[in-house]
Amino acid sequence: EEKIIDALKTMKILLKNRALLKISGNDAEEFLQNQFTNDIKKLDRKKVQFNAYCQHQGKVIAFFWVMRMGEDFLLSFPDELLEKIENRLKIFVIMSDVIIENVTNVLSQTGLINESSPNECRINDELAVVIEDSNGQSVELAENHIAWEKAYLDSHLPEIYNVTSEKLVPQMLNL
């Protein structure tokens, strides 16, 4: 266990187990504002904003990292929830000028532990994520999901997976 902690001092990890949806269109900000628990209008371009997506009884379906990319928004979450989330969000688009696009295979997500990058979105003081074109990766990245998950859990940040989806309310996640 001590060796894992030492290895976490600085690290870049390819986050292959996370899905990425792009939300765009003239009504994207208002659409997300009406769907999630946090104030999307206060989203800082260089930071990750945490948001819960709840069903009608108030139970959390998913927990997102929301980021801005130009005028668009990116939602990052465990890939096992992709189909469920994408389909559910599309139900609520109705007449809004909103496009929901799965960009998981187009853009890559790199987790940074105690490192920085000019293109980063900060999660907290220790963790950040970089979103870039999947073809543009020039650095060999570790695929050590256990190291990332340990650092993420050590930061006391929640995560929702299929097994916990629609089981908890935001207060149980300290949101």
Predicted regions and their residues:
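Basic, glycine/lysine-rich polyanion-binding surfaces/domains
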Residues: 1-175
